[in-house]
Amino acid sequence: MQFALRNLIFGHRGKPLLPPLTLTLESGQLVALIGRNGSGKSTLLQTLAGLLPSLAGQMMIKTSGRHCPESTLHADVHSIVGKVQQSGGQPLCEESSSGATTQEEWIIDFSSLSPAERARWVSIVLPTTPEVPPLTVLEVVQLGRWPHRHASLSQRDATVFVDSVLHRCGIAHLASRPMHALSDGQRQRVMLARAVAQDTPILLLDEPTNFLDFQATQEVFQLLHQLAHEEKKLVIVATHHLDWAKREADKTLEIRR
């Protein structure tokens, strides 16, 4: 899978933060996004996630059927292909006589997707906020499975998957605890676990190690390394840990303003 930005312009209230941005990122890459506070890292990540509209340009995904989120293939592949056609894209898809998509390669206009469709492609971890949902840790992490509710994964398998995510993120012992009873660092790890449970090809993280001690920070970075290099996700991390970025990231993007 490739995630391509073509002359992308992003910013606040119609005011661009940077000149047009053009680059291509790929599955299996761990990308560090660095820059001073206020440089636009968070704005860029939220634009990539579709939480903020871009001002101009395109965000395109080039992928094959085997790399598509399973729920996309089972639920609304035709709506995605149709939207690409309407937006002038070039979906390289064919249909069999039964109506199934048989050709492997697609080019998808990411910005044309609905929020539900985007949620199967990209998940994002934002900095913690004072607002705390009246839910337990387990319930919050289970929310990550909502975009895949039409997938073929059985309820039992989904439960096993969520349980494995809780263990991988080091919060299994907190599963029944209400969110309001957690520290800021624990809440941050819960939101990371929710994004991991969403199981998307693209994972965006905005300062995911805020409020974490040294040991917890190293564990999070190790998890991100595994997600990128072993599970072949595209992982983009906004961080101030410059030593880690230089040592571990496959690519470093610096925003200068």
Name these PLM-found stretches:
Residues 34-36:
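The feature captures the beta-strand-to-loop junction immediately N-terminal to the Walker
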Residues 251-257:
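H-loop (His-switch) and adjacent beta-strand-loop-beta switch element
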Residues 142, 156-174:
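Conserved ABC ATPase "signature" region
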Residues 203-206:
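Catalytic Walker B motif of ABC-type/P-loop ATPase nucleotide-binding domains
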Residues 178-182:
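Conserved ABC ATPase signature
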Residues 239-240:
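H-loop/switch region of ABC-family ATPase nucleotide-binding domains
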Residues 49:
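Helix-to-loop junction immediately C-terminal to a conserved catalytic motif
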